[in-house]
Amino acid sequence: MTDESTPDAASAPLPAPVPPPDWTGDAPGARAEAGAFTLHTGLLGELVVPGGAARAAELEALAARAAVYATRARGEGTRRVYRSAWRAFEAWCRSLGREPLSGDPELVAMYAVRRADAGVAVSTLRVDLAAIRTAHLLAGVALDMRHPGLAMVVEGVTRGRGARPAKRAAPAVPDVLRLLLGACPPAGTALGARDRAMLLLGFGAALRRSELVALRLGDAEPVPGRGLRLVVRRSKTDQHGRGQDVAVWANPAEPGFCPLAALDAWLAHRTRAKDLDWTAPEAVRRERPLFCAVTKAGRATGEALSDKAVARLVKGAAERAGLDPALYSGHSLRAGLATAAGDLGANLADLMRQTRHRSTDVALGYLRPADLWRNNVTERVFGAGKRDI
């Protein structure tokens, strides 16, 4: 239920302990820093590792191979968050004249206190600690995350601040989504058609913003008499890319609020883009981006969008609709579908099948607001007064 600008890594527990790699040697491009070398990692970028020439023999080959495996082990969103968290810790250590990869749990505890004093959420602090621990693992430097001096600080921050997640993006429930659709550019334009299709597919398929912009032309298949079948090739809960099918029903009774109609309108513009070579095999065309950039002249370019484009779309439409754009984000579409389903009494299994949540706790968070009132005993106790509400 988190916004994908801050991936679910922000609410994940610390990684399970794994034995550190037995790396000895020096990495290519090592810094001319006494007793240290630079380790190139795929997950956290460059790490300056303490150690002398005795560690130089094997690291070059191992680091190159490890970078590949480390990059595959985490999604791009998680890698961005971890890199940012590690760089912040590294800069803080350097400002104190301390070695970031010292393996000193008390130094990490000091940083945790600093972050807590800065007001970061407990979930954010856990991401910071996960990144620090991962950096030490990659560098082969032991760090005891269960050291009492560190563990007690984290426990104290959690108890004092509470582990309740920070305020979420406002859900774009159907009434809000209609306002966003009405605030899009004219329907007959390529930009208007694209924006409407992105909003309705993002909502209907409960897509994360990275999933929405990753769709290819071959990933959306109309199903006669039903709607659309989307293939989400890779997601935060499917890092190995097995693929997940998502069904989205059409809404012919309300064409302006119909994902299938919106997609058809966009494809009329998309198929005229210059990147589609109609002499090429169909398999090649099917791999082109479903949603792409649109020029000021109103032509689809075929250039893929970044996930930030989804947030800009939602916030821009919210502002034009007279809503507070600060309350909405790219995650509002996914949250809107889940919230609406909860309001309509959807059960947990059906919701998780559509949203592809792996955590029941996260999915239940969308159902609880409605369940709070459903079959509540006070309805019977105070039922006589319902007519006056």
Where are these predicted regions, by residue range?
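Extended, non-catalytic subsegments within catalytic or DNA/protein-binding/adaptor domains
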Residues: M1-I389
